A protein has these predicted regions:
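Positively charged n-region of N-terminal signal peptides that target proteins for export
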Residues: 1-6
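Bacterial N-terminal signal peptides
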Residues: 7-18
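Catalytic loop of the DD-peptidase/beta-lactamase superfamily, centered on the K-T-G motif
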Residues: 20-70, 199-204, 208-211, 216, ...
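Short secondary-structure junction motifs
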Residues: 53-55, 67-69, 109, 113-115, ...
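Secretory-pathway/luminal and periplasmic proteins that interact with or process carbohydrate-rich
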Residues: 66-69, 125-133, 142-150, 178, ...
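Active-site-proximal loop and beta-strand segments within enzyme catalytic domains
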Residues: 74-188, 195, 202-204, 229-252
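Active-site-flanking alpha-helical
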Residues: 103, 210, 219
């Protein structure tokens, strides 16, 4: 199961390409290099074969040393162009941390305050009497309707070049999901509006501002706003799966993802990006700490999302990460601060699971044991009470029965079998790091809770 919360801006031939020299890993928790690379190769090979997935590029670094950076499979299946560490992929929602950093740099200069109401910068935007502040957009607590959750109203126009006015018009009159600060729902509208705020404050187009203030100073030569029209060297083609075969992904105008998901990059550039964050070359230490420190909701409930970054852990190892999904691509970038380890996994196929690949690599790098997963028979009454549709923001989770087993399918994602662990708890069959717990009360479960990457996400039954 792919990450449930990167879905909105949602590989056959196996070919190993060593794309850059690998340095010697720093001694410590990282296991011996040659054996580690063999293990990583096996992990990615299995992911390619299970797909099909056209290509996966990965990079693993500890501190200033690259342990491995390479590509597997084909960046372009039709022309048999192999993937490498220099292959350029669309990032999807990994873009959000770039937008967050650009915004926080303006906070540091005093041009923006996190407590500013967004109408200070977007006076024509209707907040329907709600008080929406900048920090609400950064951590998905604004309650504004996400445009990628509008169904055909948005997706029917997603091939078209849409102006800011076009897109804002879709959401401006939609009821809020909740009052700002009282709930959490992953939201592309919030990050789109942040891009508009950046443009208003700087006077520059979003793409130009990031290029001049971030990409060029850091030497991120392969990172850019991923428009369809320009020639981008080493750019991967994007694919989808249809009946077990690869097909070209649906066309998406890159005007729509904008500051919520329109960047493209390579695994090597993303390693350098992470190093820049760690070394305070982008924002100072206090600002970065603010970005990775989740706030609480109005009722005191803690979040697991900072500003453009998810905060979690794996077997006690702190983890800062974000995934992305966009037409033809799935991606993830993870950093383990206690171990100074960065892992990047980029894939050019919808339905690929870079989150799981990343976690398997992390377990190998950090020398962690595989989690134990049972597959117990499910009592009939347990099946009956859990079947239904559950909503988490604009994401729908359909739970159904299939030959005595429970299957869950998230919006625009492939169905996955749930393995019963007992006591109303299940684990995703294709990602043991994702567990699902159904409420124990009542004849039918009124909600389910997803535990993923240190995050806790509650979905309410709607039918």
């Amino acid at each position: 199961m792919r990450s449930l919360f990167v879905h909105a801006f949602i590989s056959i031939c196996i070919l190993f390409i060593a794309a850059c020299p690998a340095g010697n890993p720093t001694p410590g928790t990282v296991t011996e290099a040659d054996a580690l690379v063999e293990t990583i190769d096996a992990i990615v090979m299995e992911a390619l074969e299970d797909g099909p997935t056209a290509a996966i590029s990965i990079a693993v670094a500890q501190g200033s040393e690259i342990i491995v950076a390479k590509g597997y499979g084909y960046a372009d299946v039709e022309n048999e162009v192999p993937a490498t560490a220099h292959t350029v992929y669309r990032l999807g929602s990994v873009t959000k941390q770039f937008t967050s950093v650009a915004l926080m740099r303006l906070v540091e200069t005093g041009e923006i305050s996190l407590d500013d109401e967004i109408t200070r910068f977007l006076p024509d935007y209707s907040t329907q009497g709600q008080t929406v502040r900048v920090h609400h957009l950064l951590n998905h607590t604004s309650g504004i309707k996400s445009y990628t959750g509008l169904g055909e109203e948005f997706w029917g126009k997603s091939r078209l070049d849409l102006s800011h006015d076009d897109l804002v018009e879709m959401i401006a009159d939609k009821p809020f999901d909740f009052a700002p600060g009282t709930g959490y729902a992953y939201n592309n509208s919030g990050y789109y509006l942040l891009g508009m705020i950046l443009e208003e404050v700087t006077g520059d187009p979003y793409a130009e501002h990031l290029s001049e203030t971030i990409f060029e100073p850091l030497g991120l030569e392969a990172t850019s706003y991923c428009r369809n029209e320009p020639i981008i060297m080493h750019r991967a083609a994007g694919y989808a799966r249809r009946e077990g075969e690869l097909v070209n992904a649906e066309i998406l105008s890159m005007t729509s993802p904008f500051s919520a998901g329109a960047l493209c990059s390579t695994v090597l550039d993303l390693v350098e990006w992470q190093r820049a964050l760690n070394s305070n070359r982008l924002v100072d230490a206090a600002t970065y700490e603010r970005m990775i420190t989740p706030e609480t909701l109005a009722d005191g409930a803690p979040l697991t999302y900072g500003y453009g970054l998810s905060i979690g852990e794996i077997e006690g190892h702190a983890k800062i990460s974000h995934g992305g999904g966009i037409n033809g691509f799935n991606t993830t970038l993870a950093y383990y601060p206690d171990d100074d380890v960065t892992i990047v996994v980029l894939a050019n196929t919808e339905g690929a699971n870079p989150d799981r690949v990343e976690r398997l690599i992390a377990r190998a790098v950090l020398d962690l044991p595989e989690p134990e997963v049972a597959d117990l028979p499910i009592p009939a009454e347990e099946i009956a009470r859990n079947v239904g549709t559950y909503a988490l923001g604009d994401l729908l989770l359909e739970v159904s029965e299939d030959d005595g087993r429970l299957v869950m399918q998230a919006t625009d994602q492939e169905a996955v079998r749930l393995l019963y662990q007992g006591d109303h708890r299940f684990i995703a069959s294709d990602d043991e790091e994702i567990s699902v717990v159904f409420a124990a009360e009542g004849e039918v479960a009124g909600q389910l809770t997803v535990f993923q990457g240190g995050g806790v996400y509650e979905a309410q039954r709607i039918e």
